[in-house]
Amino acid sequence: MSVVKINIDWFDHNFGAAPQNENVACVATGKTLEEVESSIVDAIRFHLDGMKAHGQVIPKEFRGEWHPEFVLTTRAQLRYSDNFITRKALSKETEINEQQLSHYATGLKKPRLGTRQKIADGILAISRRLAFIF
C-alpha cells in the first residue's frame, strides 16, 4: 500500500487540500479539517476513475491500494488548534508573541522552519498535558 502525501492549508475561511503529486490535479475545500480530508480523497478517487476511463497513465503511487498522509501547513495547524487551545496558551508554551502567532495564522507572515517546528512542538506539548488529565 502506497502513501500519498496531501498538503492542507488555510485560505480565508476554509481549509484547502491538494496532493503533492501535481500529476493528479485535484483540489478540495472544506470548513473543517475533517471535511477537507474527506473531500480531497473523494476528489482524487473521482479523478483517477476519469483518468482510467480515458486511458491516461496513472501515477505510480496511485496504482493499487493507497492511503493519504495529510501534511498541514503552520497556518492550517494554527487554525485547527484554535478549536482546542488558545493562542495565549500556545504563546506561553512556545515563547512566540501572541500577535506573531496571529500573523502566522492569517498568512500575513510566514514562519521560518525552526519557528514552524517550535509551533508544532508547542501544540503537541499542550495536547499531551491535556491528555494526561484524563
Stretches with model-predicted labels:
Residues E93-T94, G122, I126:
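Generic non-transmembrane alpha-helical segments
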Residues F15-P19, I119, L130-F132:
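Generic low-polarity alpha-helical segments
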Residues M1-Q56, K60:
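DNA-contacting interfaces and partner/effector-binding or oligomerization modules
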Residues V36, R116-A120:
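Hydrophobic micro-packing sites on short alpha-helices
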Residues L124-F134:
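Short C-terminal boundary/hinge segments that cap the last helix of small helical domains
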